[in-house]
């Protein structure tokens, strides 16, 4: 009986380790000089095929910059295209670049993923 219980606990813990249900965004914090390039990376939840990039400035609500489904850009109308670019080269990575950075780019940038 004790062996069967131990076996169940180990399998449950292993199963929990295999499911990593979170979006990873790097860097977590970035302070840069004006004019520098900033690259943000997003690793979506495994199995999610849609990635969203949002920005929230001090005086505004959350605004959608761009989103991708199956690596293809579906809407990037919220992104200033003169200095911003976004891409999703594969199913495990999306990037948002700002070049050159300006003081008005100071904001919190969010990445989210979905099905």
Swiss-Prot record:
It is found in: Cell membrane. Residues 1-21 form the signal peptide. GO terms for cellular component: plasma membrane; T cell receptor complex. The keyword Zinc does not apply. Residues 22-115 form the Ig-like domain. Disulfide bonds join 42-111. The keyword Membrane applies. Pfam families: V-set (PF07686). Keywords: Adaptive immunity, Cell membrane, Disulfide bond, Immunity, Immunoglobulin domain, Membrane, Receptor, Signal, T cell receptor. One of its GO terms (biological process) is adaptive immune response. V region of the variable domain of T cell receptor (TR) beta chain that participates in the antigen recognition. Alpha-beta T cell receptors are antigen specific receptors which are essential to the immune response and are present on the cell surface of T lymphocytes. Recognize peptide-major histocompatibility (MH) (pMH) complexes that are displayed by antigen presenting cells (APC), a prerequisite for efficient T cell adaptive immunity against pathogens. Alpha-beta TR is a heterodimer composed of an alpha and beta chain; disulfide-linked. The alpha-beta TR is associated with the transmembrane signaling CD3 coreceptor proteins to form the TR-CD3 (TcR or TCR). The assembly of alpha-beta TR heterodimers with CD3 occurs in the endoplasmic reticulum where a single alpha-beta TR heterodimer associates with one CD3D-CD3E heterodimer, one CD3G-CD3E heterodimer and one CD247 homodimer forming a stable octameric structure. CD3D-CD3E and CD3G-CD3E heterodimers preferentially associate with TR alpha and TR beta chains, respectively. This is T cell receptor beta variable 12-5. It comes from Homo sapiens. The lineage of its organism: Eukaryota, Metazoa, Chordata, Craniata, Vertebrata. The gene is TRBV12-5.
């Amino acid at each position: 009986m004790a062996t069967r219980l131990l076996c169940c606990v180990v399998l449950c813990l292993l199963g929990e380790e295999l499911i990593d249900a979170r979006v990873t965004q790097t860097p977590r914090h970035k302070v840069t000089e004006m004019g520098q390039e900033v690259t943000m990376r997003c690793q979506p939840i495994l199995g999610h095929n849609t990635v969203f990039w949002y920005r929230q400035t001090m005086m505004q609500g959350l605004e959608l910059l761009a989103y991708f489904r199956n690596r293809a850009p579906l809407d990037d109308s919220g992104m200033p295209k003169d200095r911003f670019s976004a891409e999703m080269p594969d199913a495990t990575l999306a990037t948002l670049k700002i070049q050159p950075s300006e003081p008005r780019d100071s904001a919190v940038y969010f990445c989210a993923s979905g099905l």
